[in-house]
């Protein structure tokens, strides 16, 4: 007898089921088989990032869209696909004020893609870069798209100041300017406080001391510094040429924020940044930074047709939510949901990239999930490498993909918290 599943493709389901005369339970199972058979397996076939720039540092002359264009162009080149074969570009970007219409579209066209390529910009705060890749994977899985460039970009150095209520005019008194970095990137819209204050909440509720945070921050810098010296980031980074008024461009190829000289003593001298007598300081928090990263997502079928070996397949993704003031702990639930979806245990996972929104968050989540510290942020995290908020989600995934390959390891999880009390997480497998 012919396989009814094979017959089903291209046939009206209701007509087919009536023809087969099967009962309701069998119908449900049959429909599930038909649907699942049409789901494609999304894979990542290239990944790249710029070096991370300090605030007002080497990349200050580049708008977010210009940084995005650099990685879009390079991701497509590394994937070995034709620009005209790209269906869509999805880029995360948080501080969009003043960038102009649809920053992702700007990155796409300036990145060498033709006018026929669609583009969409995502704002899911610190999770924007990873959410863009999650959306790309969904499009590939459903067959809506075939090849997608996805990632994130941010230039916090170029964030504007905003003059609220200026449109109506000021009759008397002083006008108040708002810093777009703070207002749109780092300020809780619900509790009316800086995200650093939520770090203090975690410190108190989950009993994470200042000493633990400083030790974690020091180790993040040490791991990142060691990774740079060993050339571990070399393959994932695309060099950026910085134009000069005179002479040849300066080649920028190394993450700027990392400090090899970070010590417990130097960290201990810093004052609390968000609360008198608090524990969160500028030293155990990430900086505000500039950078971009992108991956190319396609189906395993298309990768085979292209003759490209995937870096990894996207196995699952998850989101979660909690009360806004506990935003730092939101990845706990996202990772738990992801493990249920994939059927993995934490013992099955080789590497975990957890965005270091603050050192206190990384310490608390590692403890809460009983993570193996030897698997978490093995080359340092945002406390050392920086946190260009729209980029970070795609940055941690990119770094993890290259480290999985270097170790010949198989499974990895990338996760981030994000303002407002949400989190995103993704599982990949080689």
Annotated model-derived regions:
Residues 198-200, 236, 244, 315-384:
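Active-site pocket-lining segment
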Residues 147-201:
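Flexible glycine-/small-residue-enriched beta->alpha junction loops
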Residues 124-154, 197, 203-232, 294-301, ...:
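Active-site-proximal alpha-helical scaffold in enzymes
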Residues 93-147, 190-194, 261-287, 368-395, ...:
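Conserved catalytic cysteine-centered active-site region
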Residues 35-62, 74, 177, 263-329, ...:
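Condensing-enzyme catalytic core mediating Claisen C-C bond formation in acyl metabolism
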Residues 35-99, 103-111, 118, 201-210, ...:
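Conserved active-site "lid/cap" helical segment
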Residues 1-35:
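Intrinsic disorder/low-complexity segments
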Residues 43, 49-50, 62, 67-70, ...:
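N-terminal extracellular/periplasmic Venus flytrap/periplasmic-binding protein-like
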């Amino acid at each position: 007898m012919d396989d009814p599943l094979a017959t089903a493709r291209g046939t009206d389901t209701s007509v087919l089921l009536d023809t087969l005369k099967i009962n309701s339970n069998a119908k449900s199972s049959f429909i599930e088989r038909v649907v699942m058979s049409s789901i494609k397996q999304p894979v990542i076939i290239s990944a790249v990032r710029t070096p991370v720039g300090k605030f007002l540092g080497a990349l200050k002359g580049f708008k977010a869209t210009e940084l995005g264009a650099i990685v879009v162009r390079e991701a497509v080149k590394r994937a070995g696909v034709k620009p005209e074969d790209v269906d869509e570009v999805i880029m995360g970007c948080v501080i969009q004020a003043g960038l102009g219409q649809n920053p992702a579209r700007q990155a796409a066209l300036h990145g060498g893609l033709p006018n026929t390529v669609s583009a969409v910009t995502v704002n899911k705060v610190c999770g924007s870069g990873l959410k863009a890749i999650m959306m790309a994977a969904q499009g590939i899985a459903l067959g809506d798209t075939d090849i997608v460039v996805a990632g994130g970009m941010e230039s916090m150095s170029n964030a504007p100041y905003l003059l609220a209520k200026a449109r109506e005019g000021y009759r008397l008194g002083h006008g108040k300017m708002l810093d777009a970095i703070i207002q749109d990137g780092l300020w809780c819209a619900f509790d009316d406080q800086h995200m650093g204050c939520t770090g203090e909440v975690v410190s108190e509720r989950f009993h994470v001391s200042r000493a633990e945070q400083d030790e974690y921050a020091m180790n993040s810098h040490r791991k990142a510094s060691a990774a740079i010296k060993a050339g571990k980031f070399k393959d994932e980074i695309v060099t950026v040429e910085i134009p000069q008024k005179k002479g040849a461009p300066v080649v920028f190829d190394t993450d700027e924020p990392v400090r090899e000289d970070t010590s417990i003593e130097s960290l201990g001298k810093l004052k609390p940044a968000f609360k008198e007598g608090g524990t969160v300081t500028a030293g155990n928090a990430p900086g505000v930074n500039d950078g971009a990263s992108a991956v190319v997502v396609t189906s395993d079928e298309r990768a085979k047709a292209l003759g490209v070996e995937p870096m990894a397949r996207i196995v699952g993704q998850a989101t979660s939510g909690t009360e806004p003031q506990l935003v730092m702990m939101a990845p706990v639930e996202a990772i738990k949901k992801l493990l249920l979806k994939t059927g993995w245990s934490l013992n099955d996972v080789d590497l975990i990239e957890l965005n270091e929104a603050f050192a206190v968050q990384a310490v608390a989540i590692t403890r809460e999930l009983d993570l193996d510290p030897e698997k978490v942020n093995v080359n340092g995290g945002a406390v050392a490498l920086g946190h260009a908020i729209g980029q970070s989600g795609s940055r941690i995934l990119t770094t993890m993909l290259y480290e999985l390959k270097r170790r010949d390891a198989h499974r990895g999880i990338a996760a981030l918290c994000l303002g407002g009390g949400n989190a995103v997480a993704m599982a990949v497998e080689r």
